[in-house]
Every structure is written in C-alpha cells, then in structure tokens.
Design a protein with these regions (language model features):
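Acidic-and-aromatic substrate-binding clefts and catalytic sites of carbohydrate-active enzymes
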Residues: 4-8, 28-36, 60-65, 93-97, ...
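Short, acidic/polar
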Residues: 6-17, 63-78, 99, 128-129, ...
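A structural motif
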Residues: 22, 80-83, 115, 140
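Short, well-ordered amphipathic alpha-helices
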Residues: 37-42, 71-75, 106, 128-132
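Beta/alpha (TIM)-barrel catalytic core signal, keyed to glycine-rich beta->alpha loops juxtaposed to Asp/Glu
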Residues: 91-258
Length: 258
C-alpha cells in the first residue's frame, strides 16, 4: 500500500518492497504518487508479468468525460500499458453521476484493455448488490474496505464471501494502533512475532487480503514473513473479540455504512 506516501518516500518505499519480495503494489489517483510508483517499477527491472498493480479512480473523475481519460493518465504516470486491477475508489456521493454510469465506464476500461480486473472500494452491501446487477456477477474482483482488529467490517466481509468477491483490507494495522494493543502484543510474544505479523496471519485465516504499508525495509520483510505465524483457535477468537467498530476513515462523502 502507498497511501500517504509522497515523492521520494513513495518511490523508495515501493523500491524496498519490490526488493524484499512484494509483487502487489496498490496506489490511487488521489494518492498523488502514481508517477513515483511507476519510477520504482521501472527501475526494479522486474518483468511486468511478475507484478500485480492496482490503482483507483477518484470520485471526481467518475463522469463520462473524465473516467477513461483519467485512467489513461494513470497509466502514463505508472509507465504501464495496463493495470491488473482498477477500482472505483469511493461510490459517487451525489446524484449527478449514477452508479450505472460509472460502473459502465469501469467495465469499458476493462473492454479497452486498460485493466485486467475491475473492482470497487468502500462499497456497502447495498451498493455491492446494485453493482452486481449493473456489471454482472463474477465481474467484481474485490471490494477494498477498512478492516483491522478494531473494525472488522464483518457484515460486508461476509457479503463479499457469499458473492465470491475478495475482501481486501486497507489500514490493516489501524495506523499503528495494533502495535500497542496488549492482546496482540501478548499473542505476538507467544510466536516470537510482531503484532503486524499476527494481524496478517489472522486476516489470512479469515480469508481477507491485506495491503500493508511501511517505509522500513525491515518491517516490509517482516510483513512478508507472516506465513510462519500459526495462530491457535483461541488466539483467533481473542482477535475476533477486539472488534469495537472503531472506524478510522470516514470522510463526509462516505456512504451510509453497514
């Protein structure tokens, strides 16, 4: 993940992530770092087929006049011919642009070969139902939503599973809050692991895909090594119990959450 990373920091962080073995890079038009992400990809020397690159269309670009040109602009900055996954970053907050219209534009981007897969972000269950009706079942690759131990978004995650849509977690570490939580620290100690590794292992058990972010090469490598952490059923239950609906991302244009 590259949210909040700008300029050289974004470029260096992605370079470090690729060096330690990450192959999925997540960016967005709104992050203002697509060009730096593109630089890091180019200088990595990695074959395009090895990478999975995601970007997102900002809600101000969802209209017919802006949607496809904005994707072309993203690709130009990323120095790529296509992305692997293109997401609607947020559902359009007003009534000026209909869901049918911008999801139609998303499907068109796929038809044009600008992306291999399409998906959504910050969609509620109701919006997912509507989206399936517009672009068809099986077309939505993922719904990227806020998920961490303190905000588990269980209803939406369950709806995604039922629909065969991957639930992807942004902010999996709750902006560092997981590193200080006593329960997670205790479980981490049991496994000679970091709280971040514990959270990633828990997410995998719950069939949630995560996009962790770090500027530290050490932490990036640790995050990638979470597979060695095997949580017990009682530890998984303890983490499940940390859920208190503590949402971090809630802008004024957000939908009515589930």
């Amino acid at each position: 993940g590259t949210f909040r990373l700008k300029g050289d920091e974004a470029r260096e962080s992605v370079s470090k992530a690729l060096e330690v073995g990450f192959r999925h890079i997540d960016t967005a038009q709104f992050y203002g770092n697509e060009a730096q992400v593109g630089d890091a990809i180019k200088t990595s020397g990695l074959d395009r087929s090895e990478l999975f690159v995601t970007t997102k269309v900002w809600y101000e670009s969802l209209g017919d006049d802006h949607f496809i040109p904005s994707v072309h602009e993203s690709l130009e900055k990323l120095k790529l011919e296509y992305v692997d996954l293109l997401l609607i970053h947020w559902p359009y907050p007003g009534n000026d642009i209909s869901l049918e219209s911008y999801l139609g534009n998303l499907a068109k981007a796929k038809e044009l070969g600008l992306t291999r897969h399409i998906g959504v972000s910050n969609f509620t269950i109701d919006l997912l139902d509507k989206a399936e009706k517009v672009i068809g079942k099986g077309e939505i690759y993922t719904n990227q939503i806020e998920i961490h131990p303190f905000m588990q978004n269980k209803k939406v995650v369950e709806a995604c599973k039922e629909k065969g849509i991957k639930a992807t977690a942004y902010m999996p570490f709750a902006v560092g809050k997981v590193m200080k939580d006593e329960t997670l620290l205790r479980i981490a100690q049991n496994h000679d692991a970091t709280p971040a590794q514990v959270v990633l292992a828990w997410m995998e058990k719950r069939h949630i895909y995560a996009i962790p972010s770090s500027t530290s090469k050490v932490h990036l490598a640790e995050n990638l090594a979470y597979g060695g952490v095997h949580l017990t059923d009682s530890e998984l239950a303890l983490i499940d119990d940390l859920d208190n609906g503590d949402r971090i991302v809630n802008p004024d244009f957000a939908p009515d959450w589930d």
